[in-house]
Amino acid sequence: MIKVENIEVWGWEHAIRGMRNPMNSWDKSDSYPAVYCGKCGIVEREGVCQPKEHDCTPYECYALGPNDLSLMQKLFNGGTEHRKYLRQIIVSLDITAPLYWWKEFDTYKVGTVANSCSTMHKIQAKEFVMEDFSHEHLLGEIDDGLIDQDSPLGVLRTTVAMLNNMRDAYLQNPNKLHWWQMIQLLPSSYNKRRTVTMSYENVFTILRQREGHKLDEWRNLCEILKGLPNVKEIGGLT
């Protein structure tokens, strides 16, 4: 399971300006701040959608002109040494995913920053429930939602119950022994939230390396990343 929320993308204006520095070609730039709400079917150079019956301010974007897009594509195909502008376009997003996936994401340390919810400090903050864990592939569900206790899904439910027992014990007597029981018993399927900031270069690296990955989480994230502004156009993706 993976959930992605609160996506923000910025940096287009300065990235494009810097992209044109080597050839002093700023006068050829044809991109501009705009608004695209998805209802009007247009992008207005003035940043105001028509008609004006609805508020479009949450849909601010940066409209790429054909000149800038063509140069972006050319530099993109030239390789990482030529497409430095990608490292100046920034995306931030909140990702909730299981610990087993985060271990793989930590491969991408260069050019990324992640701030996570703290397991060390807050593991006891709320009751554990099955929805806190990624278990969509576990076997064991019987008709009408019943669970076979000897199945993988049943083992997870037993583990969740034990985690709650240790949590209750810790809340009644907050000593480190009970805390250790939760920390060391916590399965790698536990879903953890992080706020991640990275560049478009990181985005394209992930797409190249993970799009066909065996984990659903990677494939789902890749589909979301391909939906970021202008990613498909710049990279020639489908």
Residue ranges and their predicted role:
Residues 1-238:
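Family-specific signature for flavin-dependent thymidylate synthase
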